[in-house]
C-alpha cells in the first residue's frame, strides 16, 4: 500500500479513505490492507468461500469455517495514524452492519444500527430486479424510555439549570429597575 505524503491512507481497490465504519482497514495474510466493504464484496462473489485472494498479489488468505471477512485482523496502524477507535462491523448475509454505541452511560440517546447493502441475495435474483447500489441507512431502535429518563440526562439538567438562572436573573433585574426608579425619582 504505497501512500503519498500528506494524503490519507485509502483502500487500493475502491480508493476510498479508510475510516472506522464500513471502510475499516483489514489485513490479509500477505500484509496488504483493504477496506472491509471491498473484502465483503470479494468474498460474496468468490466461488470458494473459505479462500480469499488478495486483489493485488493474488496470495490466498484462508478463512476458518464460517468465519466472515469482518473477523480478519484490523490494521490498527492505519487507525492509529487516523486517530480513530475501531468499531465492530459484522457481515449478516449480504449486509454489513454497524451498531453505533453511545459514548457515555449518562448520555441516553437511541443507539442506531447502520447497514450497508452489498447487493441482492442469490435466491432473489430470479425475481424482481433490485437496485444493487450500496445504501447506508440508519435504523432507529425503539425505546421504552419515558420522560423520566430525559430528566436524568446531565445535558438536559445543565440546560434546565441555566434557563432557571437566566429567568431568575431577568426577574431580579426587572424588579430592581422598578425599585430604583421608585426610590430615586419618587415615581410610583
From Swiss-Prot:
Annotated membrane-spanning segments are: 158-178
Pathway assignment reads: Protein modification; protein ubiquitination
Question: What is the originating organism of this protein?
Answer: Bos taurus
Gene Ontology BP term (one) = protein autoubiquitination
Q: Which UniProt keywords apply?
A: Apoptosis, Endoplasmic reticulum, Golgi apparatus, Lysosome, Membrane, Metal-binding, Transferase, Transmembrane, Transmembrane helix, Ubl conjugation, Ubl conjugation pathway, Zinc, Zinc-finger
Q: What is its EC number?
A: 2.3.2.27
Q: What is its main location?
A: endoplasmic reticulum
Record topology, Cytoplasmic segments? 1-157
GO terms (molecular function) for this protein are:
ubiquitin protein ligase activity; zinc ion binding
PTM notes: Autoubiquitinated (in vitro).
> Topology in the membrane?
Single-pass type IV membrane protein
* Transmembrane helix in keyword set: yes
Its recorded reaction(s) are: S-ubiquitinyl-[E2 ubiquitin-conjugating enzyme]-L-cysteine + [acceptor protein]-L-lysine = [E2 ubiquitin-conjugating enzyme]-L-cysteine + N(6)-ubiquitinyl-[acceptor protein]-L-lysine
Q: Which CDD domains match?
A: RING-HC_RNF183-like
Subunit structure as annotated in this protein's UniProt entry: Interacts with FATE1. Interacts with SEC16A. Interacts with BCL2L1.
* Protein name from the UniProt record: E3 ubiquitin-protein ligase RNF183
Where does this one sit in the cell? Endoplasmic reticulum membrane; Endoplasmic reticulum; Golgi apparatus, cis-Golgi network membrane; Lysosome
SUPFAM superfamilies xrefs: RING/U-box
What cellular-component terms does GO give this entry?
cis-Golgi network membrane; endoplasmic reticulum membrane; lysosomal membrane
Domain of life, per lineage: Eukaryota
Q: Where are the zinc fingers (RING-type)?
A: 11-58
Amino acid at each position: 500500500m504505497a501512500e503519498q505524503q500528506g494524503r490519507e491512507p485509502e483502500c487500493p481497490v475502491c480508493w476510498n479513505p479508510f475510516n472506522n465504519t464500513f471502510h475499516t482497514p483489514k489485513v490479509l495474510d500477505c500484509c496488504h490492507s483493504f477496506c472491509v466493504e471491498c473484502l465483503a464484496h470479494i468474498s460474496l462473489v468468490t466461488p470458494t468461500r473459505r479462500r480469499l485472494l488478495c486483489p493485488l498479489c493474488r496470495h490466498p488468505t484462508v478463512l476458518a469455517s464460517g468465519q466472515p471477512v469482518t473477523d480478519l485482523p484490523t490494521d490498527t496502524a492505519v487507525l492509529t495514524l487516523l486517530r480513530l477507535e475501531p468499531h465492530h462491523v459484522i457481515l449478516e448475509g449480504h449486509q454489513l452492519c454497524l451498531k453505533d454505541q453511545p459514548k457515555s452511560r449518562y448520555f441516553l440517546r437511541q443507539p442506531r444500527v447502520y447497514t450497508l447493502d452489498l447487493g441482492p441475495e442469490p435466491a432473489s435474483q430470479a425475481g424482481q430486479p433490485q437496485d444493487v447500489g450500496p445504501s447506508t441507512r440508519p435504523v432507529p431502535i425503539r425505546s421504552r424510555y419515558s420522560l423520566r429518563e430525559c430528566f436524568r440526562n446531565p445535558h438536559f439538567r445543565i440546560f434546565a439549570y441555566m434557563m432557571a438562572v437566566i429567568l431568575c436573573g431577568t426577574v431580579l433585574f426587572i424588579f430592581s429597575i422598578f425599585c430604583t426608579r421608585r426610590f430615586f425619582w419618587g415615581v410610583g
